[in-house]
Amino acid sequence: MMKRILLLLLTAATIFCSCSKQSSKKLNGEYHYRIGGAVTTQTTDGKNTEYEILIEYQFGTMKIISTDSKNKTLYISMSSAMKGTFSNFTATEKDGVITFKDAEIQVSTRLPGETSSGTMSKNTTKICVDGVGKRYGDELLFDLTAKGIITTKYPDPEKGIDVITDLKVISSSIKCEASKND
């Protein structure tokens, strides 16, 4: 009787361990993604002028590789050939939730009021984000939170030059949706 109970416990432990290792491996693969949103910022020059930086919707390829199944560490690579952006960062997965901190992503940005053919629409900006994502079948949905200082440039029509400035992040609303390629 005791041997049967022990065998049953070992079988259950094996099943649970194999399932927990599988979840991060199931995320492995290539996805196509769409990212967009807005970041509210404030100048750091003492005037505290607020700007809303729009993150233009961009589409691209996301690759996820499980690098350490024991610690459920993931390597994520995002690239957009149309916008010329590329980002790499690591994340962790626990109970189906993907989290990452201090990931530096490159996005195409512009200030409101500018046309899509204006200088800012072609500006590639690096933004530091924390993110939380969840898997729904073959879909991944991420909520990203921008933080820190964003260095960006914008055209100054009065001076006729591009101005480079640091902007402090106040708040953000950035979404990323990814669908697994077949």
Q: What is each residue range found by the language model?
A:
Residues Y31-A38, E56-M62, M78, I127-G133, ...:
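Extended low-polarity, hydrophobic cluster-rich segments
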Residues S24-E52:
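Tryptophan-anchored aromatic micro-motifs
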Residues I15-S18:
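C-terminal motif of bacterial Sec signal peptides marking the signal peptidase cleavage site
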Residues K3-L9:
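Sec-dependent signal peptide recognition
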Residues I55-Y136:
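Predominantly extracellular/secreted and cell-surface proteins with exposed
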Residues G137-D182:
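Edge beta-strand at a domain terminus
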Residues S20-Q22:
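Bacterial signal peptide processing site
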Residues H32-T43, K101-E114, D143-P155:
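Generic short beta-strand segments
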